[in-house]
C-alpha cells in the first residue's frame, strides 16, 4: 500500500470541461494536513509503515494512553489515527505532515468511508425488489413474496434478502479520478460521488488495479 491521506467530505458541486463544455459532478474533500505520529520499520516492528493523525481536538477528548502515544511524536491531540503499510522504509519522520499534494490531477484513487444511514428499510428500497400491482384488486403492493418452500427445508435460508438496517456501513468507491488539487487549502476535487454525508471521515489511497480499464 502507498501513502494515503485522511479527510472530510465537504459536499458536491460541478465543474465544466474547458474543451467540451460538459459538466462534471465532483466532490470536494478537505484532505489533511495529517501529521506523522509514528514510523514503523522492518527492524523495529517487522514491517514498514507510517501512522498519521487527523482532526485536532482538545486533550480532554482523548485518553491518557492516547495522549502519551501522541506526545512521543510531539504532535497535537488528534481525533483519528490511521496506519499505511509501505513496501520500502518510509522517508518521513514523526512530526512531518502529509498534505493533499501527494496526489496530482489525473490520479486514480480509492475512497473509503461510512455510507449514509437510512434506518430500517423495506424490500424495495434496500434490495430494489419489484412492487406488486397497485390496482386490479391486488393487495400485494410492497410485500416480499415467498421466503422459501414448505416442510422442506422448513426454514428460511441464511442470507435471504429481507427488510432490515440499510446504510451506515463501510463502503469503498474505487478508481475515482482526481480532477484538481488545491495545495494551499488542502482540498481534493474528486470526480463522482463519495460515501457519506458532508462531514464524513474519508480514507483516500492510490487506487489498486482491479479488472481492466
Curated annotation (Swiss-Prot):
GO terms for molecular function: rRNA binding; structural constituent of ribosome. Residues 135-155 are annotated as: Disordered. InterPro entries: Ribosomal_uL3, Ribosomal_uL3_bac/org-type, Ribosomal_uL3_CS, Transl_B-barrel_sf. It holds the Pfam family Ribosomal_L3. One of its GO terms (biological process) is translation. Keywords: Ribonucleoprotein, Ribosomal protein, RNA-binding, rRNA-binding. GO terms for cellular component: cytosolic large ribosomal subunit. SUPFAM superfamilies: Translation proteins. The keyword Ribosomal protein applies. One of the primary rRNA binding proteins, it binds directly near the 3'-end of the 23S rRNA, where it nucleates assembly of the 50S subunit. Belongs to the universal ribosomal protein uL3 family. Part of the 50S ribosomal subunit. Forms a cluster with proteins L14 and L19. NCBIfam families: L3_bact (TIGR03625). This is Large ribosomal subunit protein uL3.
Amino acid at each position: 500500500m502507498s501513502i494515503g491521506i485522511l479527510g472530510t467530505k465537504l459536499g458536491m458541486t460541478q465543474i465544466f470541461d474547458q474543451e467540451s463544455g460538459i459538466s462534471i459532478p465532483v466532490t470536494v474533500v478537505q484532505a489533511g494536513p495529517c501529521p506523522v505520529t509514528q514510523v514503523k520499520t522492518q527492524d523495529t516492528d517487522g514491517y514498514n509503515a507510517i501512522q498519521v493523525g487527523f482532526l485536532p481536538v482538545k486533550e480532554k477528548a482523548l485518553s491518557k494512553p492516547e495522549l502519551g502515544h501522541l506526545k512521543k511524536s510531539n504532535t497535537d491531540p488528534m481525533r483519528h489515527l490511521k496506519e499505511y503499510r509501505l513496501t520500502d522504509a518510509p522517508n518521513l519522520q514523526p512530526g512531518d505532515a502529509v498534505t493533499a499534494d501527494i496526489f496530482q490531477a489525473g490520479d486514480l484513487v480509492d475512497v473509503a468511508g461510512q455510507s449514509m444511514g437510512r434506518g430500517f428499510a423495506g424490500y424495495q428500497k434496500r434490495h430494489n425488489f419489484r412492487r406488486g400491482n397497485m390496482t386490479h384488486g391486488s393487495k400485494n403492493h410492497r410485500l416480499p413474496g415467498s421466503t422459501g418452500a414448505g416442510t422442506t427445508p422448513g426454514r428460511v435460508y441464511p442470507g435471504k434478502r429481507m427488510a432490515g438496517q440499510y446504510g451506515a456501513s463501510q463502503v469503498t468507491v474505487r478508481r475515482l479520478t482526481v480532477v484538481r488539487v488545491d495545495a494551499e487549502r488542502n482540498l481534493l476535487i474528486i470526480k463522482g460521488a463519495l460515501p457519506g454525508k458532508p462531514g464524513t471521515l474519508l480514507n483516500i489511497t492510490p487506487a489498486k488495479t482491479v479488472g481492466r480499464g
